[in-house]
Protein backbone atom coordinates (compact mmCIF):
# COMPACT_ATOMS: atom_id res chain seq x y z
CA UNK A 1 0.00 0.00 0.00
CA UNK A 2 2.72 2.45 0.99
CA UNK A 3 4.72 1.84 -2.16
CA UNK A 4 1.58 2.35 -4.28
CA UNK A 5 0.85 5.63 -2.52
CA UNK A 6 4.43 6.76 -3.05
CA UNK A 7 4.14 5.96 -6.75
CA UNK A 8 0.89 7.93 -6.98
CA UNK A 9 2.52 10.94 -5.35
CA UNK A 10 5.49 10.69 -7.68
CA UNK A 11 3.18 10.58 -10.70
CA UNK A 12 1.28 13.62 -9.44
CA UNK A 13 4.52 15.51 -9.04
CA UNK A 14 5.81 14.55 -12.48
CA UNK A 15 3.94 17.38 -14.20
CA UNK A 16 4.98 20.01 -16.78
CA UNK A 17 5.02 22.61 -14.01
CA UNK A 18 7.28 20.49 -11.83
CA UNK A 19 9.65 19.69 -14.70
CA UNK A 20 9.98 23.30 -15.83
CA UNK A 21 10.41 24.65 -12.31
CA UNK A 22 13.03 22.07 -11.45
CA UNK A 23 14.98 22.88 -14.62
CA UNK A 24 14.89 26.59 -13.80
CA UNK A 25 15.74 26.37 -10.08
CA UNK A 26 17.27 22.90 -9.53
CA UNK A 27 15.29 22.80 -6.28
CA UNK A 28 13.31 19.60 -5.74
CA UNK A 29 11.30 20.91 -2.78
CA UNK A 30 10.28 24.08 -4.59
CA UNK A 31 9.41 22.25 -7.82
CA UNK A 32 7.36 19.61 -6.00
CA UNK A 33 5.52 22.21 -3.92
CA UNK A 34 4.32 24.00 -7.05
CA UNK A 35 3.84 20.89 -9.17
CA UNK A 36 0.04 21.16 -9.16
CA UNK A 37 -0.30 24.86 -10.00
CA UNK A 38 -2.49 25.80 -12.98
CA UNK A 39 -0.46 25.43 -16.16
CA UNK A 40 -0.82 26.43 -19.81
CA UNK A 41 1.13 26.69 -23.04
CA UNK A 42 2.14 30.30 -22.40
CA UNK A 43 3.80 29.41 -19.09
CA UNK A 44 5.44 26.38 -20.66
CA UNK A 45 6.97 28.52 -23.41
CA UNK A 46 8.17 31.20 -21.02
CA UNK A 47 9.72 28.77 -18.54
CA UNK A 48 11.38 26.74 -21.29
CA UNK A 49 13.39 29.76 -22.48
CA UNK A 50 16.99 29.18 -23.36
CA UNK A 51 19.44 31.07 -25.57
CA UNK A 52 19.89 29.46 -28.99
CA UNK A 53 23.02 30.25 -30.98
CA UNK A 54 23.05 27.47 -33.58
CA UNK A 55 20.52 27.45 -36.38
CA UNK A 56 19.54 25.45 -39.42
CA UNK A 57 20.60 26.94 -42.72
CA UNK A 58 16.99 27.73 -43.60
CA UNK A 59 14.99 30.93 -44.05
CA UNK A 60 12.12 31.74 -41.75
CA UNK A 61 8.63 30.94 -43.05
CA UNK A 62 6.96 33.83 -44.94
CA UNK A 63 5.21 36.26 -42.63
CA UNK A 64 7.26 35.30 -39.58
CA UNK A 65 8.96 38.68 -39.25
CA UNK A 66 5.70 40.58 -39.43
CA UNK A 67 4.08 38.24 -36.91
CA UNK A 68 6.96 38.70 -34.47
CA UNK A 69 6.74 42.48 -34.78
CA UNK A 70 2.99 42.33 -34.19
CA UNK A 71 3.77 40.49 -30.95
CA UNK A 72 6.44 43.08 -30.11
CA UNK A 73 4.00 45.94 -30.66
CA UNK A 74 1.51 44.25 -28.36
CA UNK A 75 3.83 44.82 -25.40
CA UNK A 76 3.27 47.53 -22.82
CA UNK A 77 4.54 50.98 -23.75
CA UNK A 78 4.99 54.07 -21.61
CA UNK A 79 2.00 56.41 -22.10
CA UNK A 80 1.54 54.76 -25.52
CA UNK A 81 4.50 56.80 -26.79
CA UNK A 82 6.02 53.68 -28.38
CA UNK A 83 9.52 55.14 -28.08
CA UNK A 84 11.30 52.26 -29.76
CA UNK A 85 12.14 50.97 -33.20
CA UNK A 86 13.49 47.69 -34.51
CA UNK A 87 15.68 47.13 -37.55
CA UNK A 88 15.47 43.77 -39.31
CA UNK A 89 18.77 42.77 -40.91
CA UNK A 90 18.87 39.85 -43.33
CA UNK A 91 21.62 40.93 -45.72
CA UNK A 92 24.68 38.68 -45.08
CA UNK A 93 27.18 41.46 -45.75
CA UNK A 94 25.52 43.83 -43.29
CA UNK A 95 25.24 41.08 -40.69
CA UNK A 96 28.97 40.45 -41.09
CA UNK A 97 29.79 44.12 -40.53
CA UNK A 98 27.56 44.25 -37.47
CA UNK A 99 29.09 41.03 -36.14
CA UNK A 100 32.50 42.71 -36.33
CA UNK A 101 31.21 45.33 -33.89
CA UNK A 102 29.86 42.62 -31.55
CA UNK A 103 32.83 40.36 -30.81
CA UNK A 104 32.42 38.45 -34.10
CA UNK A 105 29.73 36.20 -32.66
CA UNK A 106 29.12 33.45 -35.19
CA UNK A 107 25.38 33.18 -34.63
CA UNK A 108 24.95 36.71 -35.97
CA UNK A 109 26.21 35.39 -39.30
CA UNK A 110 24.34 32.10 -39.12
CA UNK A 111 20.87 33.30 -38.12
CA UNK A 112 18.52 34.14 -40.99
CA UNK A 113 17.26 37.17 -39.08
CA UNK A 114 19.02 39.73 -36.91
CA UNK A 115 16.83 42.22 -35.07
CA UNK A 116 18.30 45.42 -33.67
CA UNK A 117 16.19 47.04 -30.95
CA UNK A 118 16.50 50.80 -30.64
CA UNK A 119 15.52 53.23 -27.90
CA UNK A 120 14.07 55.81 -30.25
CA UNK A 121 13.49 59.38 -29.12
CA UNK A 122 14.24 60.68 -32.62
CA UNK A 123 10.70 59.97 -33.82
CA UNK A 124 9.17 61.84 -30.87
CA UNK A 125 11.58 64.72 -31.44
CA UNK A 126 10.55 64.87 -35.09
CA UNK A 127 6.87 64.95 -34.16
CA UNK A 128 7.52 67.72 -31.63
CA UNK A 129 9.46 69.76 -34.18
CA UNK A 130 6.78 69.36 -36.84
CA UNK A 131 4.14 70.63 -34.43
CA UNK A 132 6.23 73.51 -33.19
CA UNK A 133 6.62 72.13 -29.67
CA UNK A 134 9.97 72.40 -27.86
CA UNK A 135 9.87 68.77 -26.70
CA UNK A 136 11.52 69.72 -23.42
CA UNK A 137 10.55 66.44 -21.76
CA UNK A 138 12.73 64.56 -24.25
CA UNK A 139 15.81 66.25 -22.76
CA UNK A 140 15.43 64.48 -19.41
CA UNK A 141 16.94 61.14 -18.47
CA UNK A 142 13.42 59.87 -17.74
CA UNK A 143 12.67 59.94 -21.48
CA UNK A 144 15.69 57.78 -22.21
CA UNK A 145 14.71 55.38 -19.43
CA UNK A 146 11.21 54.87 -20.79
CA UNK A 147 12.57 54.43 -24.32
CA UNK A 148 14.88 51.67 -23.06
CA UNK A 149 11.98 50.12 -21.16
CA UNK A 150 9.71 50.19 -24.22
CA UNK A 151 12.37 48.56 -26.41
CA UNK A 152 12.97 45.90 -23.75
CA UNK A 153 9.27 45.10 -23.36
CA UNK A 154 8.97 44.73 -27.13
CA UNK A 155 12.05 42.52 -27.35
CA UNK A 156 10.83 40.15 -24.66
CA UNK A 157 7.50 39.75 -26.42
CA UNK A 158 9.45 39.01 -29.59
CA UNK A 159 11.53 36.20 -28.13
CA UNK A 160 8.54 34.61 -26.40
CA UNK A 161 6.53 34.74 -29.63
CA UNK A 162 9.44 33.24 -31.56
CA UNK A 163 9.82 30.39 -29.09
CA UNK A 164 6.08 29.71 -29.19
CA UNK A 165 6.50 29.14 -32.95
CA UNK A 166 9.31 26.64 -32.41
CA UNK A 167 12.02 29.16 -33.26
CA UNK A 168 15.01 30.08 -31.11
CA UNK A 169 16.86 33.27 -30.44
CA UNK A 170 19.56 35.01 -28.46
CA UNK A 171 19.96 38.54 -27.17
CA UNK A 172 23.18 40.32 -28.18
CA UNK A 173 24.25 42.93 -25.66
CA UNK A 174 27.56 43.29 -27.50
CA UNK A 175 25.76 45.44 -30.06
CA UNK A 176 26.56 48.23 -27.60
CA UNK A 177 30.32 47.64 -27.87
CA UNK A 178 30.70 50.19 -30.66
CA UNK A 179 27.65 52.47 -30.61
CA UNK A 180 29.00 54.86 -33.22
CA UNK A 181 29.95 52.11 -35.65
CA UNK A 182 26.60 50.37 -35.32
CA UNK A 183 24.72 53.66 -35.64
CA UNK A 184 26.62 54.51 -38.82
CA UNK A 185 25.98 51.06 -40.33
CA UNK A 186 22.25 51.34 -39.61
CA UNK A 187 21.92 55.05 -40.49
CA UNK A 188 20.56 55.87 -37.04
CA UNK A 189 19.66 59.50 -36.38
CA UNK A 190 20.58 61.41 -33.23
CA UNK A 191 18.57 60.36 -30.17
CA UNK A 192 18.23 56.78 -31.43
CA UNK A 193 20.43 54.32 -29.57
CA UNK A 194 20.84 50.57 -30.05
CA UNK A 195 19.97 48.70 -26.83
CA UNK A 196 20.71 45.16 -28.01
CA UNK A 197 20.41 42.82 -30.94
CA UNK A 198 18.60 39.51 -31.21
CA UNK A 199 19.23 36.60 -33.54
CA UNK A 200 16.24 34.53 -34.62
CA UNK A 201 16.22 31.24 -36.48
CA UNK A 202 15.20 27.61 -36.60
CA UNK A 203 17.21 25.81 -33.91
CA UNK A 204 19.67 23.15 -35.02
CA UNK A 205 18.25 19.98 -33.42
CA UNK A 206 21.68 18.38 -33.37
CA UNK A 207 23.04 20.93 -30.91
CA UNK A 208 20.94 21.23 -27.78
CA UNK A 209 21.11 23.96 -25.17
CA UNK A 210 20.11 23.61 -21.55
CA UNK A 211 17.85 25.80 -19.49
CA UNK A 212 20.12 27.85 -17.24
CA UNK A 213 19.23 27.86 -13.54
CA UNK A 214 18.32 31.10 -11.82
CA UNK A 215 18.89 32.46 -8.34
CA UNK A 216 16.49 31.15 -5.68
CA UNK A 217 13.28 33.16 -5.47
CA UNK A 218 14.16 34.12 -1.89
CA UNK A 219 17.01 36.19 -3.34
CA UNK A 220 14.91 37.96 -5.98
CA UNK A 221 11.45 38.16 -4.41
CA UNK A 222 10.99 40.66 -1.58
CA UNK A 223 7.68 40.79 0.26
CA UNK A 224 6.44 44.20 1.37
CA UNK A 225 9.96 45.64 1.87
CA UNK A 226 13.45 45.03 0.54
CA UNK A 227 15.54 42.65 2.62
CA UNK A 228 19.20 41.72 2.10
CA UNK A 229 19.50 38.11 0.91
CA UNK A 230 20.79 35.30 3.07
CA UNK A 231 24.53 34.98 2.24
CA UNK A 232 24.11 31.21 2.16
CA UNK A 233 21.65 31.54 -0.73
CA UNK A 234 24.10 33.68 -2.68
CA UNK A 235 26.89 31.19 -2.06
CA UNK A 236 24.75 28.38 -3.43
Outline where the language-model segments fall.
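Acidic, surface-exposed loops and disordered segments
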Residues: 1-236
